[in-house]
Amino acid sequence: MLIETYDLEVFTPPCHPETDRLSAIARPGVDLREALPYLNAILPGAVYNAAAAALLWKKDSHNVAFHADRIAVGNVPDREAAIEELENLIELVNRTWERRAEIEPSHESR
């Protein structure tokens, strides 16, 4: 398991203080950089930037950003939904990492 614990922050996006939607960030305390090419290989429509150690992805109506030091999700309706979404994303990272021997990593920027 790559991510065992994380710190969570749920907030109103500063660029949209009038919105009723929230953003959330999980900071796992481990470097996710090596997992990004594997996520890039399996997530349809992901946009990977190896130099920035970032992978952007749209999941339903949520914008998701995987960085070396954090996972961020936007456009969630409330705190509970933000926590659930981040837990699902962390599980995705962990499952992908555990299966990395079966996945051909993609370093392609799209």
Residue ranges, per PLM feature:
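Short proline/glycine- and acidic-rich turn/helix-capping motifs at secondary-structure junctions
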Residues: 54-58, 96-110
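Extended Gly/Ser/Thr-rich low-complexity repeat segments
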Residues: 34-41, 66-68, 84-91
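Ampiphathic alpha-helical segments that act as solvent-exposed interaction surfaces
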Residues: 70-104
